[in-house]
Amino acid sequence: MPEAAVVKIPPDFPLEKAALLGCGVITGVGAVVNAAKVKMGSSVAVFGCGGIGLNAVQGARMVGALKIIAVDIAPQKLEYAQQMGATHLVNAAQADPIAAIKDLTGGRGVDYAFEAISLTKTIEQAYAATRKMGTCVVIGVTRADVQVQINANEMVYAEKTLMGSLYGSSRPKIDILNLIEMHQSGKLLLDELLTRTYPLEEINTAYAALERGEVARSLVLT
C-alpha cells in the first residue's frame, strides 16, 4: 500500500470503529460538510440510507440542519436513518418522494438534497426535490453508461446547483482525525452504525444481510 494512502490514527482508537471511517463515514459526512457546506437551520433530504446515506444524515444533524428527510424503500434502513438524526422518513415504495418532500417543506423543496443510490431515477428525483437556489449533491458512483436528464431552463431560472462529491470532497489525513475527535466528543455516532460483526468464514452471510438491508454497517473480522 502506498504511504500516501495511509492515515496514522491514535493507538488507543478501536480498529473496528476506524474501519467505518475510511469509506462510508468520511464520504457521507464530507459531502455535507465539505462539498455542500450545509448551513445551520437548513432543510436536507437524503435519498438512499445505506452506509453513505446514513452518514449524510448524521452529517446534516451535526451541522445543525433543522429538517432532515430520509428517503428509502427499506423500512429497516429508514429506522437506522432516524437513529442517525433524520427528523422525517419517506418510504419511496409507498409514496412519491418528491411530493412528500414538497409537502414537508411547504411546497418549496429542500435547501440541500443528497443522492446516495447511484440511479438515474433517484438523481432526477433528488434534483426535482431541491428548492430554487438550492443544491443537489450526487454522492453515489454510477455505471459509466448512466445518463441523467435535467431541464436546462429549470436549472437557469431556478438557479439550482447540481454537483458531485467524490469521497466526501475530503482531505483524509486531516478529516479522519477530525472524525475521530468528533466521535470521542459524542457528536459522531459510530457504535450505532455497526450493526453486526462476522468471522471471515461467514462473509457470504454478511453480504446477504447487507443486500437485504438488515444492517447499517457490518464488519468481517479475520
What spans do the regions from the language model cover?
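Glycine-rich cofactor phosphate-binding loops and adjacent beta1-alpha1 units
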Residues: 36-40, 73-75, 79-161
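C-terminal hydrophobic helical "lid"/dimerization subdomain
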Residues: 124-128, 169, 173-222
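Mid-domain Rossmann-like dinucleotide-binding core that forms the NAD(H)/NADP(H) cofactor-binding site
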Residues: 4-5, 10-95, 99
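Structural detector of well-ordered beta-strand residues that form the stable sheet scaffold
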Residues: 7, 45, 69, 135-137, ...
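Rossmann-like dinucleotide-binding domain for NAD(H)/NADP(H)
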Residues: 155, 162-163, 178-183
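A general structural signal for well-ordered alpha-helical segments in protein cores
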Residues: 6, 25, 98, 110, ...
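Short strand-turn motif at the edge of the Rossmann-like AdoMet-binding core
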Residues: 2, 117, 140-143, 166-168, ...
